[in-house]
Structures are given as structure tokens and as C-alpha cells.
Amino acid sequence: MKPDAHQVKQFLLNLQDTICQQLTAVDGAEFVEDSWQREAGGGGRSRVLRNGGVFEQAGVNFSHVHGEAMPASATAHRPELAGRSFEAMGVSLVVHPHNPYVPTSHANVRFFIAEKPGADPVWWFGGGFDLTPFYGFEEDAIHWHRTARDLCLPFGEDVYPRYKKWCDEYFYLKHRNEQRGIGGLFFDDLNTPDFDRCFAFMQAVGKGYTDAYLPIVERRKAMAYGERERNFQLYRRGRYVEFNLVWDRGTLFGLQTGGRTESILMSMPPLVRWEYDYQPKDGSPEAALSEFIKVRDWV
């Protein structure tokens, strides 16, 4: 089947609505919407929930940009895109909870298509979701990865192990020699076997995010915590900032190609702290995190 960008866009708009409704149902606070237009073509809807009952900040962004030609930075690695008009669309979100026992989560699903008369379109899907705990709970990690594995199974036995490995490799801070969190799924350049199958997988990932995340939120949101846990959460959020500004391809591509800065940086935690040469106490729950986030098979 020929790629249907309109069908993908409608799914993404509905996905943004659904996820915002689900997060509001857990939190009680409403999202504020900021619609924006891109001068060069396209626009989006950025939605942010701030200082809710459960979430300190949750941002759910939809964007759809298009143009007559790809930026040179994009065609340098993919010469087949030169001379083609393009559309890029996606939903991306990050949730930063108040409670340090509730992990931060991130999800993204996206579609890209480039066309020119007389030639087949070049298209692909990408996306995934990943979890960044501050305090490790094995049952949460197992639930997260089991949900990821189960949504992948209809698409093949090898899909979950492949995209889990890709996620572990992608969300890695080389300068710290540590993982950002416990991973999940990450895929890109997906265009086989055909459009329908690839689109179905992207939909499964988009819908699977809240199935994976919200039960963990419900389990942890009422746990008592104090200043020590909050300080550790703010310190570990620093890793999130470091990854996004130093290593994340999407953030760098957006900033380098004149994307909408407010939407791109919506993933940043609202509060964060750094501490020179911080060392958690031996045997403390804080010290246990470095082992917990090391790559392993959770299911």
C-alpha cells in the first residue's frame, strides 16, 4: 500500500489527545495548549501540564512540518533525499513527576516521507519509549519491559530484543559511562515489510506507552519521601539534561535546523541540580541506582 501521511497524522493527533486525557485522569490537572505555526511550512500543538497533583511537569508535543527541500544537514548522510519535498510528523512526550519514587518517562513516535514526481516515495517510521527511575523497583522494571515485549510479539519474536538493545545503546551517556535509565524500546528507519505493517507497529508503541507507565505511577505516587530523596531526584535529573543537550539526535537536529526551541526543550526538567563529585553513601538506596540501571534482561 502507498504510504498515507494523512492517516498517520490523524492517528498522531488522536494519540496526543488520548495520552493527555490519561495523564489528566491520574493527575487531576489540565494541560495548557500552545498551537504554533512554522514559517517554512507546518506547525504543531504543544501541551504542558505544570505543578499538578502527581506530575511536576508533563509535556506532550505534536508537530507536523513540511517543506520543498530538506536541509543540507539531513541530505549529507542520505543523498537520496536531495531534491525531494518532505513531511515529518510525530508525537513526543516527557513526564517529570513530583515524587522521586515515580520514574521519569519519555515516549516518541514519528513518521517521515520525502517525495518527488516520477519516483517512489522515501519513507520510514521511528519511535520508542524509555524509563528513568531514581529509585529502582524490580517489579516496575519487569512490568515496563514485559509490556514492551508483549506489544512487540505480534510483529515477530526478534523485535523486542532488537529494539531493546537499540534503546540501551542509544540512551547511554558516554561521558559518564552510564545508562540514562532502564531503557525500553527504540526503533528508527522502519520501512519493511510494507507501510501497513510498519504503521501498525508504530501505533502499538504509541498506545503501549501508557499501558507500561501508568500502573507504575499508580503504584508509587503516594509513597512518602523527604528532602534526601528530593535532592537525589534533582541531582539525577541533571543526567537527563546532559543527555538531551549532548547526545540526543532529535534535540540537536531540531536546534540546528531552526526548529521551535520552546517545544524542543519542553523535555527539560523544571528543576535540576548539579553537585561536584557527588558520591552516595555505600549501601544506601541512592548508591544502588548505579547497579540497577546497568543493562540487563528484565524479561
From Swiss-Prot:
Sequence segments annotated as region (Important for dimerization): 240-275
Q: Out of the domains of life, which is the source?
A: Bacteria
Q: How does activity depend on pH?
A: Optimum pH is between 6 and 7.
Compartments annotated for it: namely: Cytoplasm
Instruction: List the catalytic residues.
Output: 106
Keywords assigned: Cytoplasm, Heme biosynthesis, Manganese, Metal-binding, Oxidoreductase, Porphyrin biosynthesis
| Pathway named in the protein's UniProt entry | Porphyrin-containing compound metabolism; protoporphyrin-IX biosynthesis; protoporphyrinogen-IX from coproporphyrinogen-III (O2 route): step 1/1
Enzyme class, first EC level, given as a word: oxidoreductase
Pfam families referenced in this protein's UniProt entry, alphabetically: Coprogen_oxidas
Q: Which cofactor does it need?
A: Mn(2+)
Summarize what activates or inhibits it. Answer: Inhibited by protoporphyrinogen-IX, by metal chelator (EGTA) and by low concentrations of heavy metal ions.
- Residue numbers binding Mn(2+): 96, 106, 145, 175
First-listed, main subcellular location of the protein, grouped into a coarse class: cytoplasm
Matches recorded under SUPFAM superfamilies = Coproporphyrinogen III oxidase
Name any GO cellular component annotation.
Answer: cytoplasm
The GO terms this record gives for MF are: coproporphyrinogen oxidase activity; manganese ion binding; protein homodimerization activity; tetrapyrrole binding
Annotated phenotype, changing residue 106 to L: Complete loss of oxidase activity and absence of manganese ions
Looking at the UniProt record, the site noted as Important for dimerization sits at 175
Entry EC number(s)? 1.3.3.3
> Where do the annotations place substrate binding?
92, 108-110, 258-260
Q: What is said about its interaction partners and assembly?
A: Homodimer.
Q: What is stated as this protein's family in its record?
A: Belongs to the aerobic coproporphyrinogen-III oxidase family.
What this protein is called in its record is Oxygen-dependent coproporphyrinogen-III oxidase
Could you read off the lineage of the organism from its UniProt record?
Bacteria, Pseudomonadati, Pseudomonadota, Gammaproteobacteria, Enterobacterales
